[in-house]
Amino acid sequence: MKKILLLSDTHGHVDDHMMKYVNQSDEVWHAGDIGTTQVTETISSLKPIRAVFGNIDNHELRLSFPEELLFECEEINIYMTHIGGRPGRYAKGISEKIKSIKPKIFICGHSHILKIQYDKVNQLLFINPGAIGKHGFHKVRTMVRFEIDKSDIKNMEVIEVKR
């Protein structure tokens, strides 16, 4: 079993509240718009991190992280990218990719809008953790944590932080 902390859109921001949850996880997944290498260096000094770059990320971050990640955690296939849209309105090329690779979880960021939804059409769990950084229009900063136990996704929780 693995405890996962999922975050996105840090835009260079790291704070003690976020790091408290990093410490409680086994792995941290970042869905892009990291902002600075300090973010990933701080997290990876404590826990393994899987990340994709986002549209605001500089050349250095784009060299360090891919635009999309396809990986397996326990017995679950995951597809993560920064700009993904949402069920019923996926970004260009995403629907085709999902149909091709058939992930059990699809993760994206970009919108700063927290959304967790089962996509019945593609039979996957869609997760956008919202934004944990301070830049943007969002009024509440959010992260998502959950556990993966073999082929089960459980104990999903939204963590809200005041701006």
Q: Model-found features: residue ranges?
A:
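Active-site environment of divalent metal-dependent phosphoester hydrolases
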Residues: 12-16, 34-39, 56-62, 85-90, ...
